[in-house]
């Protein structure tokens, strides 16, 4: 391909990625939700899984974009990645690392594990939004993504609770989750310590959102399509 062709391709790629993100965002915005307090609102298990998979994929995309932007703006040359390995607050939850491991887990246990991970992010996502608002010169794109992820995480958690209610009606799962204690680090006066705390939190969010996305796709195949997919 000539140089002109490569130039055209390079100029089109960001536009295609933007269109893809906009379409995914529109898909999330148009997902059917039962009105709060609705008594007779029934959504099929298949529709619930469809919605959950779209939401989880959307959250993972936003998490990856937010982490990548933060990394470029604040973490270059600081060696944060070597310190971030195995330092997530959700590491206390035993989560399968790949598809093969996840396939060995009973679907009931995997559903409950997703609930625990999602609940473990309620508090840190709330404080992430609050602290990013207070960051000097923090770009609006990072703040807007943090706000969107917090909202969609709540929606996904509500959807997962409905899924568990249909798969195992009458069974109430204990609200077990991993406690996050990283707020003081996000508020440290030392810039390097504070920036690493943000970096680590976003790194863990990207990791966990990717796991949830994969687990949900596996569960949808197993439960909705009886593993015929």
Curated annotation (Swiss-Prot):
Gene Ontology molecular function, alphabetical: hormone activity; prolactin receptor binding
Keyword annotations of the record: Disulfide bond, Hormone, Lactation, Phosphoprotein, Secreted, Signal
Residue numbers bearing the Phosphoserine modification: 56, 64, 120
InterPro entries linked to this entry: 4_helix_cytokine-like_core (IPR009079), Somatotropin/Prolactin (IPR001400), Somatotropin_CS (IPR018116)
Signal peptide span: 1-30
Disulfide bonds: 34-41, 88-204, 221-229
Primary subcellular site in the record, as a coarse category: secreted
One GO term of the biological process aspect: positive regulation of miRNA transcription
One Pfam family from the record: Hormone_1
GO cellular component: extracellular space
Cell location: Secreted
Entry function: Prolactin acts primarily on the mammary gland by promoting lactation.
Oligomer status and interactors: Interacts with PRLR.
Record-stated family: Belongs to the somatotropin/prolactin family.
Stated name of the protein: Prolactin
Organism: Ailuropoda melanoleuca
Taxonomic classification: Eukaryota, Metazoa, Chordata, Craniata, Vertebrata
Gene this protein is translated from: PRL
């Amino acid at each position: 391909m000539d140089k002109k062709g490569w130039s055209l391709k390079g100029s089109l790629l960001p536009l295609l990625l933007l269109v893809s993100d906009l379409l995914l965002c529109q898909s999330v915005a148009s997902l059917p939700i039962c009105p709060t307090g609705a008594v007779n609102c029934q959504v099929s298990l298949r529709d619930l899984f469809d919605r959950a998979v779209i939401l989880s994929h959307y959250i993972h995309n936003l998490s990856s974009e937010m982490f990548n932007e933060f990394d470029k703006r604040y973490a270059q040359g600081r060696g944060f990645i070597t310190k971030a390995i195995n330092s997530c607050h959700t590491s206390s939850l035993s989560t399968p690392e790949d598809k093969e491991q996840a396939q060995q887990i009973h679907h009931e246990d995997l559903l409950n594990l997703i609930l625990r991970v999602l609940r473990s992010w309620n508090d840190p996502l709330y404080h992430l939004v609050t602290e990013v608002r207070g960051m000097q010169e923090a770009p609006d794109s990072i703040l807007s993504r943090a706000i969107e992820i917090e909202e969609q995480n709540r929606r996904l958690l509500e959807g997962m609770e409905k899924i568990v209610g249909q798969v195992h009606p009458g069974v109430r799962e204990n609200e077990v989750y991993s406690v996050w204690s990283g707020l003081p680090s996000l508020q440290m006066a030392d810039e390097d310590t504070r920036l690493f705390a943000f970096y680590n939190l976003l790194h863990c969010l990207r990791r966990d959102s990717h796991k949830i996305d994969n687990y949900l796709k596996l569960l949808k195949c197993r439960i909705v399509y009886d593993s015929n997919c």
